[in-house]
């Protein structure tokens, strides 16, 4: 009798999974891949949308595969667009970053054993696809060690192959509006992927083409010789270094020949000033958001050992979330639920890879010419900046967007001014030529959705809907 009961339950589960995996028209042949369906993550709250995760083989001979995590839109997924999100680094995980600490539907709980809902998840506005790229990041891997020596060009080509093969798994998205988004070094990843997609489209005549509708990049690395001096301008303007030290750095440091990996040809005075800046600011400042407190790993681990919540809140933000997601994603039951780590990698999951031998000289490349090609193809470009980030501050991004607008001979179509979210200033925005937008997000970190989820969702929703950020002022304040 017991065996019959278990058999009945097994059949019921299979039927449920098959029904859940069917397409919206009930046609399984046109549906999503059953083998990649994530029925439920450990400790996950109940949700109505579906999740999928697994691998896409990029090069079977080399044994190179990229891991993805896909989340349906919360409502009307059949009509909402598809957004690909990429984290930067280079070499950091879009699953650990974008999906589980920023804009995905779940955050880890303070005990690192479960999940809680993110009420401002971007899947309210779009279907979301997160990919760990290149191979060697997160659970993406290669059986050919030389593949871990890589750079921007090969990363973009692999991502093009990934998108083509992922769409074979999910064919109903072939005609869907596609948006590309990311942050930090994705200021290289996203424009270069958009560029190869547009090149691919140009060669396709009447065959399949990507329906690319826009790209959005947050606190992006665009041009190193402008983004680096912006760091020290930020330190000075926020009172983190003295007037004298700020002037010394600005006058003695030639950032024109700065490189991504090595000290540029700097004077002794410049070197001493830069080192002094690091000493004054100290390691106890969160460079990604100077307002937030830092998380002390030893205290976090002590709390967990005492079976307390390891969460530490600062300005309403869990500053220990990166440690929580590290522990959560290394749980065997989590990896099993995500169909991850299928080759039993000989190392733990980590947010940023130590395997990659990335071509860091690629970081010196100027992304403005690529962005110019994208805009000239009538694909809208949004650059957004959390204004508390000192790593890639808004000061550099804003001047670079203006430089790009001037190069395109664009007029200002929306003058620089405040935009509003829930009656409060969400940030400031300017638009050029109806195709190029720069927006700040007030009070936001390098990882904008992490520290300002409501404002980030408002910005993202406006982006995918093709709307301008609202300039309309709220009612006047009264005493």
Swiss-Prot record:
Gene designation per UniProt: SCPL44
PROSITE patterns, per database record: CARBOXYPEPT_SER_SER
Chief location of this protein within or outside the cell: secreted
Name assigned to this protein: Serine carboxypeptidase-like 44
Keyword Glycoprotein found: yes
GO process annotations (BP): proteolysis
Organism in which the protein naturally occurs: Arabidopsis thaliana (Mouse-ear cress)
GO cellular component entries: extracellular region
Family stated for the protein in its record: Belongs to the peptidase S10 family.
Catalytic machinery residues: 184, 389, 446
